[in-house]
Amino acid sequence: EVMESLSPAQNVVKIVLDELIELLGSTESKLVLSNRIPNVIMLVGLQGSGKTTAAVKLAYLLKKQGRSPLLAACDVYRPAAADQLATLGGEIGVPVFRGDGEHPVDIAKGAIQEAVDHLRDVVIVDTAGRLQIDEQMMQEAVDIKKAVKPDQVLMVVDAMTGQDIVNVVSTFAERTDFDGVIISKLDGDARGGGALSVRQVTGKPIKFVSMGEKPDSLEPFYPDRMAKRILGMGDVVGIIEKAQEAADAEQLEAAERMLREGFTMNDMLDQMKAVKKMGGMKGI
């Protein structure tokens, strides 16, 4: 009876939604870490894709989960790249191994030894951004992978990358055989349609999406929510989860009081502060 009550247009939307969810992977693909200490996570991607900020956000997420991460600054080419990572790492209380003046492979290996010496259980290797046509830089990524044998290699992909994303991810998949994808800058105008290409072309799962600039803006990837976003249907569940994280015991008590006594201007101010805590209207 429910299906019969839908209009032809609604039926088409439902069919497209189901197919999109299937294309994007059906279920959440979690980050899998091994029992060895330290675990090593290596990030690769194009120049300007947002690897450094993604590395910091991933470190923050792992720290919240009870891990003790260490960031490795292996980008020796971009001016002040190590300084940027050190600054961002300091803001979230995660140390950064720089290995000033060394080769990226040596820095990555040194970071692992640093983690062993200081009881850090996860090393996140932030590599230099590269072009898929730059053979020397691509080989460097391969060399780093061979040297540190990472548990996970994650490719960071800009959500606003155009149609060339197919060639980009194909090249990286062939050379680095990455394990999963982080979609960055999804808080912009792009709805994430490029994510479809990544999953279809490589068969690699999308692990996380970055929804903003703040350290806590890295979220697990849910195919059903992304499919709804692409179709312009919004992510209601995601908004509810953000509201639950932003709400504290006092706010819950205030909500119960509002139901009993009514809504005041002070209550409106509290609600506006809560929305701001969630990242503002743009973050929602």
Regions found by a protein language model. Name each.
Residues 121, 125, 141, 278-281:
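Alpha-helical transmembrane segments of polytopic integral membrane proteins
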Residues 1-23, 29, 36-39, 100-102, ...:
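Non-catalytic, charged/low-complexity accessory segments that flank nucleotide-binding cores
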Residues 76-77, 101, 127-129, 159-160, ...:
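Conserved Walker B
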Residues 44-45, 126, 156, 210:
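Short beta-strand segments
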Residues 109-112, 120, 132, 136-146, ...:
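Conserved phosphate-handling catalytic cores of large alpha/beta enzymes
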Residues 1-74, 81-101, 107-117, 121-125:
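Primarily NTPase-proximal linker/entry elements flanking Walker-type ATP/GTP-binding cores
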